[in-house]
Curated annotation (Swiss-Prot):
Tissues where the protein occurs: Expressed by the venom gland.
Annotated InterPro entries: Spider_toxin_CSTX_knottin
GO MF annotation terms: toxin activity
Compartment(s): Secreted
Lineage of the species this protein comes from: Eukaryota, Metazoa, Ecdysozoa, Arthropoda, Chelicerata
Protein's UniProt name: U6-lycotoxin-Ls1f
Organism: Lycosa singoriensis
Presence of keyword DNA damage: no
Proregion span(s): 22-25
């Protein structure tokens, strides 16, 4: 009975560790697009979105994972 409980506990711990590792791998790294998944930027990053214009006509929105405390200004 103790062996069965111990085995079940080990399996639960292993599955939790695998889920956590999978969640960490799923994050979007710095300067990669996050338009479709804005909440998936890696830790320390935020998804910042911009409207794209071509010849004065809006062509959609694009989002990128950038550092949280960094502000970009147009040139």
């Amino acid at each position: 009975m103790k062996l069965l409980l111990f085995t079940a506990l080990v399996l639960v711990v292993i599955s939790l560790v695998e889920v956590e590792a999978e969640n960490e791998r799923a994050c979007i790294p710095l300067e990669k697009e996050c338009t479709k998944t804005p909440g998936n930027c890696c830790s320390g990053l935020r998804c910042d979105c911009y409207r794209r214009f071509e010849q004065g006509v809006a062509k959609g929105t694009q989002c990128w994972c950038i550092e949280k405390d960094v502000t970009y200004k147009g040139v």
